Amino acid sequence: MGSVALILKVMPESPDVDLEALKAAMRAKVPSIQDIQEEPIGFGLKALKVMAVVSDQGGETDALEEALSSIEGVERAEIAELTLT
């Protein structure tokens, strides 16, 4: 089996969400995260771009999306980019 590298765009619930605490919660819940970067959206809101590498087995990317979406302070998480490694 191979691996899949993906970038997910994670939207916080509001500009008031503590992004550092959110990053720590994501890293604790999903150990496969390689990097997290902030991306300004507008009106003080910033999205988090999360880079992770997971197995290419069926359901792994969906499970990652669901894990990130379930974290308190996250409005939604969606795959922005995906490539085989």
From Swiss-Prot:
Gene3D superfamilies, per database record: 3.30.70.60
SMART domains reported in the protein's UniProt record: EF1_GNE
InterPro entries in the record: eEF-1beta-like_sf, EF1B_bsu/dsu_GNE, Transl_elong_EF1B/ribsomal_bS6, Transl_elong_EF1B_B_arc
Keyword field contains Transport: no
SUPFAM superfamilies reported in the protein's UniProt record: eEF-1beta-like (SSF54984)
Entry GO MF terms: translation elongation factor activity
Keywords linked to the UniProt accession: Elongation factor, Protein biosynthesis
Pfam families: EF1_GNE (PF00736)
Membership in a protein family: Belongs to the EF-1-beta/EF-1-delta family.
Function of the protein: Promotes the exchange of GDP for GTP in EF-1-alpha/GDP, thus allowing the regeneration of EF-1-alpha/GTP that could then be used to form the ternary complex EF-1-alpha/GTP/AAtRNA.
Protein name from the UniProt record: Elongation factor 1-beta
Species this chain originates from: Methanosphaerula palustris (strain ATCC BAA-1556 / DSM 19958 / E1-9c)
Originating gene: ef1b
